Amino acid sequence: MRVMINQVEYLLPEGAKLEHALEALQAQHPFAVAINLQFIPKSNYGQCALAENDQIEIISPVTGG
């Protein structure tokens, strides 16, 4: 299935979970994730099934002064 992650198209197997997509991308903590503009708590990554055309945003914190 096709999903967009940070505006880049990826093909994932049907039934893929968010946790597997993050592992495949080697995402480094800390970060937050939103799917279709909906924040997903870290505790739900393993249960969150992805669907065709999902828009996933991986957001890393920015520090500054």
Roles of regions detected by a PLM:
Residues 1-64:
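Ubiquitin-like/PB1-type beta-grasp interaction modules and other compact soluble beta-rich domains
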